[in-house]
UniProtKB/Swiss-Prot annotation:
It comes from the Eukaryota. Its main location: secreted. One of its GO terms (molecular function) is cysteine-type endopeptidase inhibitor activity. Keywords: Plant defense, Protease inhibitor, Secreted, Signal, Thiol protease inhibitor. Residues 1-23 form the signal peptide. This is Putative cysteine proteinase inhibitor 9. It comes from Oryza sativa subsp. japonica. GO terms for cellular component: extracellular region. One of its GO terms (biological process) is defense response. Gene3D superfamilies: 3.10.450.10. Belongs to the cystatin family. Phytocystatin subfamily. It is found in: Secreted.
Amino acid sequence: MRTSSLVLFAAVAVFGAACTAAAGDESWKTIDANDRHVQDVALWAVAETDWASATGGLTLNTVDGAEKRFEAGVNYYRLTLEASSRVVAKYLRFQAVVYEEGDEHKLVSFVPIH
């Protein structure tokens, strides 16, 4: 009984890992970072983030990379961007994930990267 439980547990773990990998980064598609809509989404994300107020305001400099995922009628954008701060005299790099459904946007994450 104990051996069959371990085999079942291992099978479930492998299946779960396979499902996670299938739904992971492979579903993101690279898109044109210079596309006007991508630029608009990036501008919105920079204005929306708490980092903007914490650093005295952020200004979008460039979108260095852009990926898109379409899931259940919703667009998700994963953007690698560079912004500058009026207070911190240097360029900062961030990864932003934005949810877009119709005209509605939500900032899923906005994290600094190196």
